[in-house]
């Protein structure tokens, strides 16, 4: 179960709190003005059934944690707001197929992590970056033609192989974090109570997480910042040619922008000169230079 509420004055902003017990735990996150709380309980057995929770389920589950302390003398019943709460079963697992034809999956659609370690969101972002970089590469290599399904399938296979190792590792870390916070067995209890602080301080934060952040993927493309570029790009894709417009050219004024969009624009590719030419245009001539070539 999750819920949001105004941050209590007794809890400083930016602090994170955990309340742990056998098979149950609470995680508290605090922002500047609001706080978020997550209540976890271990199911008697793993389940593949879809569960739809109603408002009465949320209230009943929250009431079972009502006297739990979430921060010093602050208890759950003092802060929880049922009107902003929701509830569902946590799902975890990795699908076998990440793509089919021209369709590719990212984030929770292909790998679900428990939320305790916050690794699901971060892996989803890395999936998108890896996918965008892979698609950009195959589109660039295709020249002025659209990549066919066979080329996309090879690209998505590369994307899968690139991401398989990182999210397999994070899946294990996320799984362990959930079970440690709920004391799933004696080993998890001992490790969480007596060893985890040393482990998290000296190994997890200083080495594992730092290395992962430093080796994270970044986009290899330029993002168009001009409204003109975005509109022209969509116009040209539906017309004569399809290409990635990487030169963000900002129009001088709205009048010029309207003239360009109203004009009958036809773009011809001069392959021999590797430049763009705009013809049949009633608007003023627009010269576009390739930033990568200066």
From Swiss-Prot:
FAD-dependent monooxygenase; part of the satratoxin SC1 cluster involved in the biosynthesis of satratoxins, trichothecene mycotoxins that are associated with human food poisonings. Satratoxins are suggested to be made by products of multiple gene clusters (SC1, SC2 and SC3) that encode 21 proteins in all, including polyketide synthases, acetyltransferases, and other enzymes expected to modify the trichothecene skeleton. SC1 encodes 10 proteins, SAT1 to SAT10. Its EC number is 1.-.-.-. InterPro entries: FAD-bd (IPR002938), FAD/NAD-bd_sf (IPR036188), FAD_mOase_fung (IPR050562). It is an enzyme of class 1 (oxidoreductase). It holds the Pfam family FAD_binding_3. Belongs to the paxM FAD-dependent monooxygenase family. FAD binds at residue 108. The keyword Nucleus does not apply. GO terms for molecular function: FAD binding; monooxygenase activity. Its cofactor is FAD. This is FAD-dependent monooxygenase SAT1. Keywords: FAD, Flavoprotein, Monooxygenase, Oxidoreductase. Trichothecenes are sesquiterpenoid toxins that act by inhibiting protein biosynthesis. The keyword Transport does not apply. Pathway: Mycotoxin biosynthesis.
């Amino acid at each position: 179960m999750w819920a949001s509420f105004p941050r209590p004055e007794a809890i400083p902003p930016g602090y994170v709190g955990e309340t742990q017990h056998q098979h149950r735990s609470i995680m508290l996150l605090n922002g500047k003005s609001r706080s978020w709380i997550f209540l976890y309980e271990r199911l008697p057995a793993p389940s593949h059934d879809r569960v739809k929770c109603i408002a009465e389920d949320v209230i009943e589950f929250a009431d079972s944690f009502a006297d739990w302390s979430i921060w010093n003398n602050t208890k759950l019943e003092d802060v929880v707001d049922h009107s902003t709460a929701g509830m569902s079963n946590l799902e975890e697992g990795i699908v076998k197929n990440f793509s089919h034809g021209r369709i590719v999956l990212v984030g929770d659609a292909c790998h679900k992590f428990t939320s305790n370690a916050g690794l699901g969101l971060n892996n989803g972002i890395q999936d998108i970056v890896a996918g965008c970089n892979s698609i950009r590469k195959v589109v660039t290599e295709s020249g002025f033609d659209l990549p066919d399904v066979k080329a996309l399938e090879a690209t998505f296979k590369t994307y899968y192989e690139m991401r398989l190792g990182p999210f397999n590792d994070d899946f294990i870390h996320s799984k362990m974090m959930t079970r440690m916070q709920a004391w799933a067995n004696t080993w998890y209890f001992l490790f969480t109570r007596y060893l985890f602080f040393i482990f998290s301080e000296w190994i997890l934060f200083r080495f594992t997480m730092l290395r992962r952040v430093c080796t994270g993927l970044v986009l290899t493309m330029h993002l168009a910042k001009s409204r003109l570029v975005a509109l022209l790009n969509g116009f040209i894709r539906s017309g004569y040619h399809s290409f990635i417009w990487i030169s963000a050219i900002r129009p001088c004024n709205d009048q010029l922008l309207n003239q360009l969009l109203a004009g009958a624009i036809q773009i011809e590719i001069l392959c021999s000169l590797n430049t763009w030419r705009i013809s049949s245009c009633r608007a003023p001539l627009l010269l576009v230079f390739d930033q990568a070539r200066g």
